[in-house]
């Protein structure tokens, strides 16, 4: 009987110790990467998990950027937030003002892991840095700039030089007419119209998007993208639209699919769209810089980043935060950051990742792969071309989409639409300013 008891006790202790040995800290990571990008996120997580058996990063696709941000905030309010939330760049002010985050530099400090914030490319890191402390609040992950993708085969058919994409918007308008005359149904389409046609158009041409240096200097900023230069640009696109040379295909990244399917000869889209274009395009394509306005003195200036960063959510235990810190450290290692850059088309987020990519000969073997980086570093940023930090910016983008759509459908003139977008957007800015002071 005693022997049986000892055996049972020994078995129980053995199972208990086995359970402790097998205890794994699960770390949910909500993101918006789909297609080839999602596969690469899964690959990074799997490799981290294999090297760190005490932790399990669980990537979960939660829809597009807006949907993921909304889901993350809603989950935080009910106590069910993920440990890591990917948030697009225009959600930065919203996340900073929320009580939902644990600053990334604190996560590393508490975990006892050395975190060199200077390793990140300054233009990228500046977007996510707290002006008061000078520390990173979130970790840059998939940063991008808009680039021009063009169908070299279609260029040849239209009698255009396949190695010379249009450099200015005026040239692009001429090219689209020739491409359409040569039989292309769609000469040009644009993804993310607010980000590319107003936010980046403004920065690339050395124009402010909003006062207070685009909101970096205070929450009392007002929108300023209804000035003559921006109105003229939207008018050019509307003129192309009436001729059938510019096709509006959606608010997000729909134009990328239209491009790699061969429907559209050119598109401006995120540099991060390269992964899907590389996978699905069945023709020769090239990558060029964003066009600039030939009539604006000093253009082009510098591009501002899009994409997203990784935010750490409040309310987790110490072991979870230690695992998060290890995973973020893993992502920033030169070999991993360089691979992410090379496979996706997103910018190298660290200087070491850029240098490693260059040393590996990647840019020599893949002409155009460094376009996004060169645009970002084209000229030292002006105070109002280093990015945007405006409250309620996701909602302002929706307003911009609505008003631009009223231009493409002929309901409003470019001036009317941009004036209305500025007025409606400023109401949201005042609401955010009031809430941030309460």
Swiss-Prot record:
Name listed for the protein in its UniProt record: sn-glycerol-3-phosphate-binding periplasmic protein UgpB
Signal as UniProt keyword: yes
Binding locations of sn-glycerol 3-phosphate: 65, 89, 144, 270, 307, 346, 397
Main location: periplasm
UniProt entry keywords in alphabetical sequence: Periplasm, Signal, Transport
Subunit annotation: The complex is composed of two ATP-binding proteins (UgpC), two transmembrane proteins (UgpA and UgpE) and a solute-binding protein (UgpB).
Signal peptide positions (record): 1-23
Any one cellular-component term (Gene Ontology): outer membrane-bounded periplasmic space
Function: Part of the ABC transporter complex UgpBAEC involved in sn-glycerol-3-phosphate (G3P) import. Binds G3P.
Gene label: ugpB
Record family assignment: Belongs to the bacterial solute-binding protein 1 family.
Top-level taxon of origin: Bacteria
InterPro entries, per database record: Bact_solute-bd_prot1 (IPR050490), SBP (IPR006059), SBP_1_CS (IPR006061)
